Curated annotation (Swiss-Prot):
The keyword Cytoplasm applies. GO terms for biological process: regulation of centriole replication. The keyword Iron-sulfur does not apply. This is Centrosomal protein of 76 kDa. Pfam families: CEP76-C2 (PF15627), CEP76_C (PF24652), CEP76_N (PF24654), CEPT76_peptidase (PF24656). Belongs to the CEP76 family. The modification Phosphoserine is found at residues 75, 83. Interacts with CCP110 and CEP97. Coiled coil: none annotated. It comes from Mus musculus (Mouse). Disulfide bonds: none annotated. Keywords: Cytoplasm, Cytoskeleton, Phosphoprotein.
Length: 659
């Protein structure tokens, strides 16, 4: 790791200060004199460096220095947003607290000082040193800044001890470089969004809690410091159940020269809540009126999937338009199709439901979806629509059904030439929509739909909401002329803007930026490949078979895996000819080659191997019997933002055909 010159000199200065504080130089001089007296033979002229190092180590000086310096590479667990602004998350080290701080800006220092009453983990035994255990991770977002705590073992009283430095600023013109005062900060209504994630021993993540912290109480506290007890509630069906308590300390830096009275702060917060409640009430009145008018067009509209409100992870009803917003990926994603691939490799998991019955509704806020790294079809569709809007496309989320009448959400883009394109967010596939004419002559050739969608009830984005009022809600017969009010009933854009525009209400969750991947693709690819080799060898050993690996054949599989991912990202196939030519050269006459590629969105080698064995063709390769059998396996991990990844694996074998 290379440091810029100014950082290197700063680090040297800190180390020098610490060494001076410990009087290390004086102790070294004492030990040097003592060593010369005791160990230098009369015929020796000088001590070697190695002799001195041994003496220092023997007397514990080196250990003392290392303990005092206490390098904390792991404690600075931070993620960089796609915007240039760097966020800082750090531990309790006082030296770190004083670095990387711009003295001309205002900061809020948020410390998490442990947790308690996580009763689900009351009986959890304390993990042994080195033992893999389930962990909690706290993720934060505040005004385009993302933070992540160190993972701590799950316990009734989890040992959270992290600090996060949040910059508080106004984006308005002229205020960018001015330090925010108390009055300015009181007008910044953005909450701190905190998401608690549990990761089990297999790497599976669970959303435990999602909490919006109102931080402005610190503006009315003495010395600009306050301690809070935050009760975290569960998600989904458990949104009324407490899952645990966090102890939080808030501190303004630099300290406020003038604090506000608590009465002023409380009045401002109450006024904001009142305004938000009134806007939401007026929108609800309007939505009810719109729905009545929609049903008057045709009574059968009552059975269509027209989704105006949806519950988030905390069980709060929000207008669906608030789940979508133009989202720019910075330099993390280059094209709309690459964005579709990124959304596709995020895991798919339906919201958990206790007991039987229908599907549990849970449209996650974007931070909860990204931190958990998986979600339902609506979460994927909302994110993909937001990214496509960021690329300047006219994109909408479609709500309807697919085969067997299962509710589903997907994305639609409208081209300037009238082309309607469906994007399936769970697979990355795209389909051109060509409507069939139900009144056409029986023998007339009609376009055959390739997409899996059956009906469509409504479409929406951050500015528009339209209900399908055509005679049939079948997708194949739908005309997507969204300006034709006889086919699509629109909601008032002003009404939507009043509750869904950025900053319109204080209850609107802000959209976080995407974070770059923290996964090293080469290292991870190699690790999974080594694990798979071991699993294959053990499996064949159980069958009484020997295993001979051919590294060159494994290497030749790389272009194929790269080609498969390129095709998924661009819909263009390339490089297959060179791969086939190389394989023909590598397989001698009279030998047979077999290959089996497979794709995963997780990095668990054992789980992937078990899945591969369920394929008869793959099992045939792994359990290959014959003369001169040579096996090969190649793994290629392709990383995407938010540490999402596409994992391509190819098993192959070549053997001499014996007839």
């Amino acid at each position: 790791m290379s440091l810029p010159p100014e950082k290197a000199s700063e680090l040297k200065q800190l180390i020098h200060q610490q060494l001076s504080k410990m009087d290390v130089h004086g102790r070294i001089r004492e030990i040097l004199a003592e060593t010369i007296r005791e160990e230098l033979a009369p015929d020796q002229q000088h001590l070697s460096t190695e002799d001195l190092i041994k003496a220092l180590r023997r007397r514990g000086i080196i250990d003392d220095v290392m303990k005092e310096l206490n390098f904390v590479t792991d404690s600075v667990d931070q993620e960089l947003p796609s915007s240039p602004k760097q966020t800082v998350g750090f531990d309790k080290q006082s030296t770190l607290k004083k670095t990387n701080v711009d003295p001309t800006r205002r900061y809020l220092y948020l410390q998490v000082l442990g947790g308690k009453a996580f009763l689900e983990h009351l009986q959890e035994p304390e993990p042994l040193p080195g033992q893999i255990c389930s962990t909690f991770t706290l993720c934060l977002h505040y005004r385009n800044q993302r933070f992540r705590s160190k993972p701590v073992p799950c316990a009734c009283e989890p040992d959270f001890h992290d600090g996060f430095l949040l910059e508080v600023h106004r984006e308005s013109l002229g205020d960018g470089t001015r330090m925010a005062d108390s009055t300015t900060m009181l007008s910044i209504s953005d909450p701190i969004h905190m998401v608690l994630i549990k990761t089990d021993i297999f790497g599976e993540t669970t959303l435990v809690a999602s909490y919006f912290l109102e931080w402005r109480s610190v503006l009315g506290s003495e010395n600009g410091v306050t301690n809070l007890t935050v009760e975290l509630m569960g998600v989904g069906t458990e949104s009324k159940v407490s899952v645990g308590i966090l102890n939080i300390k808030l501190e303004m830096y630099p300290p406020l020269s003038q604090t506000l009275s608590q009465e002023v702060v409380n009045t401002q917060l109450a006024l904001e809540r009142q305004k938000t409640a009134e806007k939401e009430r007026l929108f609800l009145v309007y939505a009810k009126q719109w729905w009545r008018e929609y049903l008057q067009i045709r009574p059968s509209h009552n059975s269509r999937l027209v989704k105006i409100f949806a519950q988030d992870e905390n069980g709060i009803n929000r207008p669906v338009c608030s789940y979508v917003k133009p989202l720019r990926a910075g330099r993390l994603l280059d094209t709309p199709r690459q964005a579709a691939r990124f959304v596709n490799v995020l895991g798919y998991e339906r919201a958990p439901v206790i007991g039987g019955g229908g599907k549990q509704e849970q449209w996650c806020t974007l931070l909860a979806f990204l931190c958990r790294n998986k979600g339902d079809c609506e979460d994927h569709a909302n994110l993909l629509c937001s990214l496509l809007l960021g690329y300047g496309l006219e994109a909408f989320v479609c709500v309807g059904t697919k085969a067997k009448g299962a509710p589903h959400a997907w994305v639609m883009t409208c081209g300037t030439d009238g082309t309607i394109m469906f994007w399936e967010s769970l697979t990355g596939h795209r389909y051109i929509h060509k409507p069939t004419n139900p009144d056409g002559p029986p023998l007339a050739e009609q376009p055959k739909p390739l997409y899996p969608y059956r009906t469509i009830g409504c479409v929406f984005n951050h500015q528009m909401f339209l209900g399908n009022c055509q005679p049939s809600d079948a997708v194949e017969t739908c005309i997507f002329d969204l300006n034709d009010e006889s086919k699509w009933k629109p909601m008032s854009e002003e009404a939507i803007k009043s509750v869904c525009a950025p900053g319109a209400t204080t209850s609107l969750p802000p959209f976080p930026p995407l974070c770059a991947s923290t996964i090293d693709a080469s290292v991870t690819s190699n690790e999974i490949e080594m694990q798979l080799r071991l699993l294959v060898s053990e499996h064949r050993k159980d069958l009484g078979l020997t295993t001979v690996w051919e590294d060159q054949l494994s290497y030749l599989l790389s272009p194929a895996l790269a080609s498969y991912e390129f095709e998924r990202t661009t819909s263009i196939s390339a490089g297959n000819e060179e791969f086939q030519d190389a394989i023909r050269r590598a397989v001698p006459d009279g030998h047979t080659f077999k290959g089996f590629p497979i794709h995963f969105v997780y990095r668990n080698a054992r789980r992937a191997f078990a899945t591969c064995l369920r394929s008869p063709f793959c099992e045939e390769i792994i359990c290959c019997r014959g003369d001169q059998v040579r096996l090969a396996v190649r793994v290629r991990v392709f990383t995407y933002p938010e540490s999402a990844c596409a994992v391509w694996i190819m098993f192959a074998c070549k053997y001499r055909s014996v007839l």
